[in-house]
Amino acid sequence: DCHILINPHSIEQFLDALDRSPPDWGLVYGHGHHDPALDERLFTLNRERDAKRNGKEPLQWTVVFLWSAELSRYDPTTGGFGMAIGPIFTQTKWGIVRFKPEEVPSNLVVIPEPSTREVLRRQLEAGQKVDIEIAMVGRLIPEESLVYDFSHDEEGLGIIMPVVRIERVEYLLLR
C-alpha cells in the first residue's frame, strides 16, 4: 500500500497528517538570512516538530514521489542510458516541497526494452533532449522525517524536505 505524493493536494494531505499545520514562516524568518537568530529558530522549529510527530502513523507509510531526469548517454555495455537527475519542486499551501532521498545512487542506469532503446538512441544521436521521471519509493526516516528550511534563491520562501530512505526506483518515460 503506497501513498502517491506527486501533486500539491496529496502532498498537503500527507503534511497535514504529520504536522497538522504549516509553520508561521514569517515568524521563523524574522529579519531574514542575515538575522543572527534565524538558524536557532529553524533548529528549534525542526526539533519541536520532530518530537510532536514521533509515533505518528504516516512515518510508517510507504511513499512514492517523483524526481526529474534527462538521459545523457547510451552505454552499449549495459544496454542502458546514464542520466542527470534532480528534484521536482512542488508549490503547496505549506511552502515549496522538495523530497530528499537519504542516498541517491550516482550510477543509475535506465535499461529500456529493445524497441524503446533504439528510439531513445536515435533521439539522443539527433541531439534531442529526452526527459524521464524517476518514481522513488520508500519510507520517511523517523529521526529526520521532515526538514524545514528557507530557499537560498528567494527571500523568505519556506521549503519542506521530507527525507526518505529509498527502497525502489522506477523510471517513467514521458510521451
Where are the regions that the model predicts?
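OB-fold and OB-like single-stranded nucleic-acid-recognition modules
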Residues: D1-R175
